[in-house]
């Protein structure tokens, strides 16, 4: 039987294997969670058109702050002998202060944060401790949060006046700046984590290659974080272009070809596509489709349409890519509904 070595710190006993599991498995999970938060911060930034909505700034800074703080704490958990011993861990590990965490990290590495990276840490720390729950404080000036974010964006262009109307193309430069600096900061801490994990023979850095965390930490090895977000939007556009240009007769294309489309306002299509590429659905589009459904007097027809729509993008549906014989075309829709997984009726 394997002979476990016991480490005794602060009166607590912990097996060496348990510490290894904590650093390798638990911190690996934390790394993926951190990546999700950071990705959401960038994704939200890609979707904004200005700084007039406080809730959008809150989401950007909250998810960014939480994601980076988790990275800092992961690294400290790797360098500490027993990070689960509450009596011996540094105070900053159980608090929320990005600067104090960075000071502790600097005791274990010679790597240095960039000037912009340190500034962004300050914004996150300030937000997390002073603005995260500011709406619960009567009399708290909501404009201060906007000023906090602008104070960082001005490092890209200090002369820009955010209080004056600007073209979207002008604002894009600031979105790119924040996302790229966020990506650099995330990459900085990830590399510290990866190097330390390899040094102590843990697998903390091994993450799901199809996760958002991989897009944050791994894809940014060969492109900037902003470029990563742009290629994701371009991928959606390329798919839409392919579907529009290729009149196929197999797979999901046959279903799309057989269905009648609803009437749409061509002038609004580009706005709908913009929201789609940003990972959201246009509110006007939702209201319009809902209204058209309500106007469908034929309940059976409305039910059938919803059943067909339920097949599109449904991973449990396997489309036949073989050519259909002419005499099979009439039974196509009926055969598609033989699966017990597809629910019918107005519940869709």
Functional labels for PLM-detected ranges:
Residues 2-4:
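Aromatic (phenylalanine/tyrosine) cluster motif
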Residues 44, 48, 107, 111, ...:
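Surface-exposed polar/charged interaction patches
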Residues 66-70:
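Long, contiguous alpha-helical bundle segments
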Residues 73-150:
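Short non-catalytic regulatory patches outside canonical folded cores
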Residues 131, 144, 163-169, 348:
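Intrinsically disordered, low-complexity segments enriched in charged and polar residues
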Residues 150-212:
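Amphipathic, Lys/Arg-enriched alpha-helical patches that create a basic surface
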Residues 209-348:
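Charge-dense, extended regions
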